[in-house]
Every structure is written in structure tokens, then in C-alpha cells.
């Protein structure tokens, strides 16, 4: 005869699921674009946790899109191949040799690692880059920087077709040039452009910081676009947070409902953000 021990852990689990119900209903059939930064990928355990979160999103009716970076992995491969990098105003020049390494690492290593882990956790993921089906057509950002591109034309129909078949797109931030070039695209920029093209309900920028901070170093849990602009102007937002918040502003201006900057190294960060009252990072909305 079986017996049941209604211990506190089980009761807490049931209470958590019950509390999540309004959020499960809110995000049913929603499009959520998730940018997974190279520094947020961390260990195999962190990757497994992230993949489980993404699979769960799809299981409860969300249409997730993963856009990934890979800067640390690219740097390691360039060093291994003894390819020297030039910099202009602190930005790497992406020459022919470098863009070949970038594509090899992003599409051939990082992308497939994420795809494989999502599939191992029970999802159906497909690896793409912005070159596939002309998803992301780019113009050269600055001739001095070489093969660095800015998305100028988006074709997201392929992604919608994948949603219809419960497939999770995992996208490397590479764009197609109009003359057959391959362009390296900033990962945040690529994620923002894809989210805007899909009119996503959420753009989640997973990084290695806990969110946008005020002058006292405290994480701000919710901000309006105007506040972000003021904080950039007065220097409160500085350094690497500037391009992330600028991506957020561009995405909001182009139809994304809200953007969140959060620490992707935290276990279940995506679930905490979407399915709990207080979220997990800095939520940015339109004014």
C-alpha cells in the first residue's frame, strides 16, 4: 500500500505553481526573445539550467527565441590561431580572417552547444544565423571596422513558421550583406532587431550584471525609457551598460512591449523574471 507524506517542500511547490498562474496566462502564446551573452553562459551546469528554462517556456505556451553572443570564445580562438586584432576607438576591426573565425565559433561551436543542450532537455531547437532565409540583412556599420554590420532589413517569417511547429530558434548574430558578405553583428543589437521585427512581448538581455543601477549602486527594478535617457545623459549609466540600454530603447521604439536586463548567471533567471511578482532584473518600459 502506498502512503503519501505531504511534506513542506511539496506544499511549497504547489503554492509556487499556484502563484505563477496569472503569469502563465499572461505569457500564453507570447514571443520572448532572449539574448544569452557570452559571459552569462558560464559552466555546463549554467547552460543546462538555461536550457531547461527555455524548454519549460515552450512547454507552457511561450514562443522563445534565443540569440547568443560568444565574445570570450571568439577571443580564445583568435588567440589560439595567433590572429592579432586591431582596434579603432576601442572597437575591434573585423577583417576577413577575423570574420571567418567569428562565424566558425558562433555558428559552429556556441550555437550548436546551445541547440544540443535544449534538445537534450526535451525541446526541439534549430540553430540558425541571421544569414539563413535572409533573416537579418545588414549594411556595413563603419568601413574602418571592417565586416561589422548594422541590421537594416529583417525577414522574420521563418521564425514564425518554426513557432507553428513548436521549434525553438537559436540564432547566431551574423548578418548577410547585400553583396554576399558576412557581417559580425553585436549580439544585443541583433537580439533587439529580431525582437522588434517580431513585435515581441519581451526582450530579455541576459548578461553578467544584475541590472541597471542608480548612483548608489542599487539595482532599479523598473524604469521608463525617459529615465534611461536621463541616466545616460548624466553619466549614471556608463560603460558596457550604455549599449545594452540603447538596445532596449531602440527595441521599445520599434514595437517591443518591454525589455529586461538581468543576470543570466542566476539559476532560473528567465523563469524568475517572467513568472514571479518581483522579477529578476531591471524592467524597462515605454514612457
Curated annotation (Swiss-Prot):
Binding site for substrate: 70-71, 92, 184
One cellular component term from this protein's GO annotations in UniProt: cytoplasm
Pfam families registered for this protein in UniProt: AA_kinase (PF00696)
KW Kinase (keyword) present: yes
Documented EC number(s): 2.7.2.8
One of the GO biological process terms: arginine biosynthetic process via ornithine
Subcellular location, principal: cytoplasm
Subcellular location: Cytoplasm
Recorded metabolic or biological pathway in which this protein acts: Amino-acid biosynthesis; L-arginine biosynthesis; N(2)-acetyl-L-ornithine from L-glutamate: step 2/4
Catalytic activity: N-acetyl-L-glutamate + ATP = N-acetyl-L-glutamyl 5-phosphate + ADP
Record GO terms (molecular function): acetylglutamate kinase activity; ATP binding
Site annotation Transition state stabilizer: residues: 35, 244
Keyword vocabulary terms for this entry: Amino-acid biosynthesis, Arginine biosynthesis, ATP-binding, Cytoplasm, Kinase, Nucleotide-binding, Transferase
Family, per entry: Belongs to the acetylglutamate kinase family. ArgB subfamily.
Its job: Catalyzes the ATP-dependent phosphorylation of N-acetyl-L-glutamate.
PANTHER family: N-ACETYLGLUTAMATE SYNTHASE, N-ACETYLGLUTAMATE SYNTHASE, MITOCHONDRIAL
The protein's name in its UniProt record: Acetylglutamate kinase
Organism in which the protein naturally occurs: Ruegeria pomeroyi (strain ATCC 700808 / DSM 15171 / DSS-3) (Silicibacter pomeroyi)
